[in-house]
Amino acid sequence: IALGAKMAKADGRVTRDEVTAFREVFHIPPSDERAAARVFNLAREDVAGFEDYAKRIAAMFRSNDKPCGQDSVLCDLMEGLFYIAAADGAYHPEEDAFLERVAVIFGLDGALFERMRARHVPGGPPDPYAVLGVDPRADLETVRQAWRAEVRATHPDRMLARGIPEEAVKLAEARLSAINAAWDRIRTGRGA
């Protein structure tokens, strides 16, 4: 909750759209809403201290073999933070710096961070190669394999099976749409 609130404040102000996005990403049982609101309101006062929250979260969820693999809670949380950052229709340099620092703390690989940014940042169609995490010079079969791996990892049914809240599954659906659109653009562009 605190990290999401600090993300919303990263550009200097918390908008209604960001609060709505926060509620879509983080499922809070009705019995905990008052306490969660207090934590959110305290945390959104200032961005300072976000690194400590990120470190604690990373320590709780990082697995030894893959600090932020495709099935990682940390990756799901990063996707949620991107969603909050882009909720107001603008993506500010301060938000980018915040997310980049959190990604480093989470152990997120740079290419995966770029793919997430390409999927979420508003303003023009994302680079389809960045969305799929492949080099533009890769052959079509390599691109297809990357697309299939992303679809498998992102499929909403798989997310539900992992116990991800339904609200977060909406993010997976948007992510899957971006992945499929990237594959379609590449395939069409190459005449396949």
Pin down the residues of each PLM region.
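Small-residue-enriched hydrophobic alpha-helices in membranes
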Residues: 1-7, 13-192
